[in-house]
């Protein structure tokens, strides 16, 4: 019997340190779960808490579904009614969660790399809790990145040579940053489009910026990004933002949809701004993978959580 190649990690905070083999193993494991494969048998209870300090519906719900499918005990956490509002630090909150017996915390936070203090405790600090990053500011979004890779792999069967366009509010998108790096490593050709004031030359090492209409007929994957108005408080372009004008220049409308190759897929991390990034009546079109991404997210998050269970030898796994 062939031995399963299973990933084992003490924390899951970024995709940058994952090898191509580990990414492949996570995709295979997620597809196994999706196809009805048995979940690992836990011989000891495992307690997990979802600590979302930024609004979320898809990611939060998806993680909780994944946790329950794996048989974990979910400990509720509501930041609006926590001692964070009294000035408690994230480290101290995590210390308390560790002390009461929580084994893993899934965290979304507005601060980039908030997890550094949690996974690298300073001298005389004894925090010992697994951390899964559900999104840090405009930094990384590993679970979204990996569910996107799963969705692409499910459709095409490979990454090598695929042409992928990342379109929209790139500077403020943690999804874009995770995906551009990993797609490049997996052999895809990455292109960028969208407002140039939301693009930085630091992304040139991953791909090439082009006007959208030049990319439309050539791409295999159109990865659309939400315009993140909540991160534009200091952006002078925000006050001049016009949704209709954005859609006309950077959105996928019916004309552009018809110009896509027959096998091209459209992806979006959600929530979709209808008639901004994508025409509203195309959200459930054949090429749009939005709901497929959400479905795959549950199974990929199961694979990610299992990797941390194994990495920390929780539930009797190793």
Curated annotation (Swiss-Prot):
For this protein, the record's InterPro entries field holds: Asp/Orn_carbamoyltranf_P-bd, Asp/Orn_carbamoylTrfase, Asp/Orn_carbamoylTrfase_sf, Asp_carbamoyltransf, Asp_carbamoyltransf_Asp/Orn-bd
Q: Does the keyword Transferase apply?
A: yes
Annotated EC: 2.1.3.2
Q: Name one GO cellular component term.
A: cytosol
Q: Which GO terms describe its biological process?
A: 'de novo' pyrimidine nucleobase biosynthetic process; 'de novo' UMP biosynthetic process; amino acid metabolic process
Q: In which pathway does it act?
A: Pyrimidine metabolism; UMP biosynthesis via de novo pathway; (S)-dihydroorotate from bicarbonate: step 2/3
Out of the domains of life, which is the source? Bacteria
Q: Which Gene3D superfamilies does the UniProt record give? A: Aspartate/ornithine carbamoyltransferase
User: Oligomeric state and partners?
Assistant: Heterododecamer (2C3:3R2) of six catalytic PyrB chains organized as two trimers (C3), and six regulatory PyrI chains organized as three dimers (R2).
The record's comment on protein family reads:
Belongs to the aspartate/ornithine carbamoyltransferase superfamily. ATCase family.
What's the protein here called?
Answer: Aspartate carbamoyltransferase catalytic subunit
Q: Which organism is it from?
A: Lactobacillus gasseri (strain ATCC 33323 / DSM 20243 / BCRC 14619 / CIP 102991 / JCM 1131 / KCTC 3163 / NCIMB 11718 / NCTC 13722 / AM63)
Query: Which lineage?
Result: Bacteria, Bacillati, Bacillota, Bacilli, Lactobacillales
